[in-house]
């Protein structure tokens, strides 16, 4: 069964714990000695963007939008990769990168609808859903570093069926709240 990730942006508080946990888990530098101009903080497999504040319905709104690889079933980055450095793990469906094969052409960046690919020192970095934590190739449930570190419990990793069920439940909750708000 393929694995997936979903971030409930209504719960994300923008604390950046996911970024710190991911960098520690993957031994990525927080700040390189000689930072390149375009990426002074080193590679980030997950980024968090602040959206807002803005006024809607006479209220101030702001939310945070984590950006990371969502491991698309038909990942366009795999098709676009000219050197076949991006591939799917057959058992888990996780999109992975062979950095030794990556030539840094950035063709994957052009086609990713999420802006997930990160380049640092000429190599591609993508979230790998902490595949090394999944136990025996996805059969044993363990938390990813970002999921375990999130104090708001906004990050969810599971099988595609589990994630679809969570997203469906969230959509139903939102629809109920909107219906209630309109009825007032």
Language-model regions: role of each:
Residues 1-184:
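Non-ligating segments of multi-cofactor redox enzymes
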